[in-house]
Amino acid sequence: MKIIGIGNALVDILYCLDDEHLLSEIHLKKDAMTLINERWEHEIEKMTSDVDKFMANGGSISNTMVALARLGREVGFIGRIGDDEMGRFFDAKLRDAGVHTQLIKGLEATGVAHTFVTPGGNRTFGTLLGAAYYLGPHDITEEMFRGYDLLHIEGYLVQNQELIESICQRAKQAGLILSLDLSSFNVVSKNRTYFHHLISDYIDIVFANEGEARAFTGSFDPQEQLRHIAHLCDIAVVKLGDQGSIAMLEGGRIYKCNAEYVENVVDTTAAGDYFAAGFLHALTRGHRLEKCLQIGTILATEAVQVLGSQLSPAAWNRIKSSIHCR
């Protein structure tokens, strides 16, 4: 099966912080994604001028597609970039990983996610969407999905409901399975009713972390969260951090996978994205949910041990060896 993803095309600028004080000074909500404007970005740049930083490809769904490509899968990515250095950087990184890109170029600058990593590997985003903000229904054609079997969608896109509705309709018309990552608890909180419509009408597979699942369902019980989501779609997955992950088919039993112990968690930025890649890789190879969770966990375990989303060749060799042994 061939997999394509659609989401915000962003370049990450990563900052490693010794504590959380700077986050309050630049008015970013800890452990959440906040949309910023150009003036706000200018303030962030001014206040972080003496903080170590580096640039890497970002965007939740593009991370997942890169991970799938590294596992040898045929994958694609749809997004919108600017005709600028950041856009060329983004495109080149995806292509180098083996991802087929369908990138619409706009007049706006390529989007940037200022990503702050605090002790314990937690991350906070100040995101200037730039060109990604202008991805619209007119950019999406059914032809983009031809030849693919599954579409993985970024939950952040619900902030443009006309766009995500168009994406889902055209992908369904093309016969694709639809997978959705809820992406952010504050986005879910603001769009709870619309997410309910989207999932019940279009989505086959849902990924959520515990915070997102709580925002969507109103429940603090992970198993109740899982049942609620699974009632609306075919497969529900709730990620529980160091408590592992759970999944179920609609009306079926609950499967659980424990997290692997990691002595030094560096950065959780791409952990959920890599988990989704491992899960979808196994699922589209016909494996049971229990094994899908295990393979997702293998990838997430490696992801939290590096800063950013790029794993070394040695890490990919460990991943492939672990998958082969399961």
Where is each model-derived feature located?
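Conserved phosphate-binding/catalytic region of the ribokinase-like
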Residues: I3-C16, I26-T34, S49-D50, T193, ...
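Glycine-rich phosphate/adenosyl-contacting loop at the front of the ribokinase-like
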Residues: M1-I78
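A glycine-rich helix N-cap at a beta->alpha junction
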Residues: R95-T110
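Anion (oxyanion) recognition and catalysis
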Residues: A69, R95, K172-Q173, A230
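Conserved phosphate-binding/catalytic loop of the ribokinase/pfkB sugar-kinase fold
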Residues: I104, T115-V158
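Conserved beta-alpha-beta core of the PfkB/ribokinase-like small-molecule kinase fold
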Residues: L150-R227, Q243-S245
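Hydrophobic beta-strand scaffold residues
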Residues: V75, T101, L178-S179, A236
